[in-house]
Curated annotation (Swiss-Prot):
It comes from Klebsiella pneumoniae subsp. pneumoniae (strain ATCC 700721 / MGH 78578). Its EC number is 2.7.8.13. It is an enzyme of class 2 (transferase). Its cofactor is Mg(2+). The chain crosses the membrane at residues 26-46, 72-92, 94-114, 132-152, 168-188, 199-219, 236-256, 263-283, 288-308, 338-358. This is Phospho-N-acetylmuramoyl-pentapeptide-transferase. The gene is mraY. GO terms for molecular function: metal ion binding; phospho-N-acetylmuramoyl-pentapeptide-transferase activity; UDP-N-acetylmuramoyl-L-alanyl-D-glutamyl-meso-2,6-diaminopimelyl-D-alanyl-D-alanine:undecaprenyl-phosphate transferase activity. It comes from the Bacteria.
Amino acid sequence: MLVWLAEHLVKYYSGFNVFSYLTFRAIVSLLTALFISLWMGPRMIARLQKLAFGQVVRNDGPESHFSKRGTPTMGGIMILTAITVSVLLWAYPSNPYVWCVLTVLIGYGIIGFVDDYRKVVRKDTKGLIARWKYFWMSVIALGVAFALYLAGKDTPATELVVPFFKDVMPQLGLFYILLAYFVIVGTGNAVNLTDGLDGLAIMPTVFVAAGFALVAWATGNMNFANYLHIPYLRHAGELVIVCTAIVGAGLGFLWFNTYPAQVFMGDVGSLALGGALGIIAVLLRQEFLLVIMGGVFVVETLSVILQVGSFKLRGQRIFRMAPIHHHYELKGWPEPRVIVRFWIISLMLVLIGLATLKVR
């Protein structure tokens, strides 16, 4: 919005030209989202407390979590608000990639909101019925994936980028839709599963978004894309604005979500952020990179799959409790230790993922 306005005002004052610089807009996008989150935080927490929208804690969970019962949840609303406002202010409104991310972000946010609302009002830890949750997540993911396929069919936008290989970029064809679907839905659920401790999900999300900001900048720059042997995608540059908005909103939320948390993001935040990371990876053609950089989310999800599979097939559990962060809690690790160590691992994985762009 402000970019569009600046384009019309630059003929009156050349200083408005600064709004056309991607680096400037990336910085102010981060700061805008950060300040909105920090401003909304106390007001959102007070409002949620007044409405008695408190966290519902499972009775079979770690005993240390019982003290979290009643902590305000659905704080993801402030994250989504901060991201959306910042992106609308600082990104080019004509960029289709921006609208793809906002569609998934807001769509998954609405699904998460309904899920959270059922939990806090009905005091039901199950929330929205699983099949309906997956149905609506699938509708959004398939809709966006199909639209992207039609727009980018037989172009670099539908190729598969394989790490460590320069010239291995097979054209996916219709398999692009299937891959995009699994990445978007899978990442949404993976971040949702990770969001079980104070600050555990938001910081890896910030790290991955920051990593994708760098990738988006390189992908939208023809010289750097050619240098790194990745597809040049002319719309990708504006995803830098989206990624920095996620970073800013996430850091602002962490101010209130750090241990001991004053507010939880709820499904409205975790599903939306996961879906956003998924669609960003799809748009940048970096699904494999997401697996590396988002390794914490992958391991959390695999721990649940292995736990359920082992119990059904052998009648035995692999972990004391899944997702795996609860396993370490039950082993006696203090919650802050689990959180910070997972953060460290996440940061290392993002750096390793970025390094793979050069190792080809």
